[in-house]
Design a protein with these regions (language model features):
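Flavin-dependent oxidoreductase catalytic cores
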Residues: 1-201
Length: 201
């Protein structure tokens, strides 16, 4: 059975939008928050706290999304989210913004597969018991040829889902998705397609 996930769009799909969407159209199977950016301060911004306030997400399946390249920052946020009742987190390796990629975050981290592998290893070694992690990814930063190596890394870890946008970071949302890259996806986790989904006419 097909499921409908509401992907995040910064500045648009915050908690008020989620509440209104669910009330008017019925709830999506999952809502992903706009990304939270845990860092060395070990604090969330006010707007981030609003996004993850359990009272703002009552009755909805909400998955907080994290954008970072440091396992220790991810794990700090995981502990905070676990304490608020969340049991699934999404690791954002898909946001194509140049300012994100330049910091080796999002798909910027995909250009450094050893760092990505080490980050995932530390995350899964330190997660709170009962917390699961899904990954939202592009198929590479600069070249679709990066995809087989990245896919081999993802296959090493017990992801709850692998969400794939079959474009590289440099393509942003332009051109035709690399359907062959999506067709190559296989692993020990459910795979979810993202990008260029249109209603039939």
């Amino acid at each position: 059975m097909n499921k409908l996930y509401a992907a995040p769009m910064e500045g648009l799909t915050g908690y008020l939008w989620r509440q209104v969407h669910a009330a008017l159209f019925g709830p999506a199977d999952k809502y992903f928050t706009p990304f939270l950016s845990p860092n060395a301060t070990r604090t969330f911004q006010r707007k981030e706290l609003d996004e993850i306030d359990p009272a703002h997400n009552a009755g909805l399946y909400v998955v907080p999304q994290l954008l970072t390249n440091r396992a220790e920052h991810f794990l700090w946020a995981a502990g905070e989210l676990y304490a608020r009742g969340y049991r699934e987190i999404n690791f954002n390796l898909g946001c194509p913004a140049g300012t994100v990629a330049a910091k080796r975050k999002g798909p910027g981290l995909l250009a450094y597969p050893q760092e990505l592998d080490h980050c995932l290893e530390e995350i899964f070694a330190g997660l709170p018991r009962g917390m699961s992690v899904s990954v939202k990814t592009r198929i590479g930063k600069n070249d679709p040829a990066e995809w087989p190596g990245l896919l081999a890394i993802y296959r090493k870890y017990p992801l709850s889902e692998l969400i794939v946008h079959p474009r590289i970071q440099k393509e942003f949302y332009k051109g035709v998705p690399h359907r062959d890259a999506w067709a190559a996806v296989s692993g020990p986790w459910p795979a979810v397609y993202n990008g260029d989904t249109f209603t039939p006419v």
